[in-house]
Amino acid sequence: MKIKATIDRIPGGLMLVPLLLGAILHTAAPGTAEYFGSFTKGIITGTLPILSVWFFCIGASIDLRATGTVLRKSGTLVLTKIAVAWVVALIAAQLLPEYGIEVGMLAGLSTLALVSAMDMTNGGLYASLMNQYGSKEESGAFVLMSVESGPLMTMVILGSAGLASFQPHHFVGAVLPFLIGFALGNLDHDLREFFSRATQTLIPFFGFALGNTINLGVILDTGLLGIAMGLLVIVVTGIPLIIADRLIGGGNGTAGLAASSTAGAAVANPVIIAQMNPAFAKIAPAATALVATCVIVTSILVPILTAMYAKRMGNPMPAQHGASAGKEKMAPEMH
């Protein structure tokens, strides 16, 4: 059977197919991990440790000479994404009730839901797409995307200063595996080549684990509003990200479009913020459902749109990027 070849024909399939399988399992049998326990539970719920190892390998695969490119690319994408979410918050604050719409077709729509869906990029999805359609440096450009993680940026954008404190050691913890891998890969070329091979191997594993955090039933709960909001996230953040990538990041826009998704971790933001500020408690459940739907919609559409855009731009294969950037051997390309 040509299972791998079939998956390769699907845009972002190495990430998307396992993610959908995980979401189906989580929806149909949410207690599977607890029932079997042990190693099976580890594969189903191991998003964080799997991503940690993958993050280490990504760091090891990047040449020291690419540092400037990585920082410029990641800084451009992160700042653009946050700026867009901030502008959306300003506009939404003028058009929507303080704590969201409670009745009608738009019931559940709130500034909290919009900002939570737009200010965090799915770093794993972005990096896996760049591993296919970009360079290693672009794949590693999500090093600064950890700044977006958690409720901090959402709370700052919402004007809730003082309700949450940012602990520097949490940021250090987020980038430490990458930095250790980066150091080892640059100290020893053989280690760089060795760890680089694992970058693609781990993608379906964290895709499956991430899928097991998503319940497909949320689409039914939020209806067309959730789907429309997912499309809005791609359009509203994607266009500025493409422009910024072309004008500032030094790319052709592919990385910008690949960053126009909603992070799975963003689903937790409304509840966390509501715990810190009870005023948001009433709208947190609806906001959570909307953000979860955005995760599903963007996880499906962003790989497809990125593949179409990359083809239109005539992107070279990853191996060609790696040769021009670092003259080093790269992991087998993911089609």
From Swiss-Prot:
Membrane topology: Multi-pass membrane protein
S-S bridge residues: none
Reactions the enzyme catalyzes: 2-dehydro-3-deoxy-D-gluconate(in) + H(+)(in) = 2-dehydro-3-deoxy-D-gluconate(out) + H(+)(out)
Coiled coil regions, renumbered to chain: none
Keywords: Cell inner membrane, Cell membrane, Membrane, Sugar transport, Symport, Transmembrane, Transmembrane helix, Transport
Entry's localization field: Cell inner membrane
InterPro entries (UniProt xref): 2keto-3dGluconate_permease, 2keto-3dGluconate_permease_sub
GO MF terms, alphabetically ordered: 2-keto-3-deoxygluconate:proton symporter activity
Signal peptide residues on this chain, from the entry's feature table: none
Any one of the GO CC terms: plasma membrane
Pfam families: KdgT
Transmembrane segments: 10-30, 42-62, 77-97, 100-120, 141-161, 163-183, 200-220, 224-244, 254-274, 289-309
Annotated family: Belongs to the KdgT transporter family.
NCBIfam families (UniProt xref): kdgT (TIGR00793)
Protein's job: Catalyzes the proton-dependent uptake of 2-keto-3-deoxygluconate (KDG) into the cell.
Protein name: 2-keto-3-deoxygluconate permease
Gene name of the record: kdgT
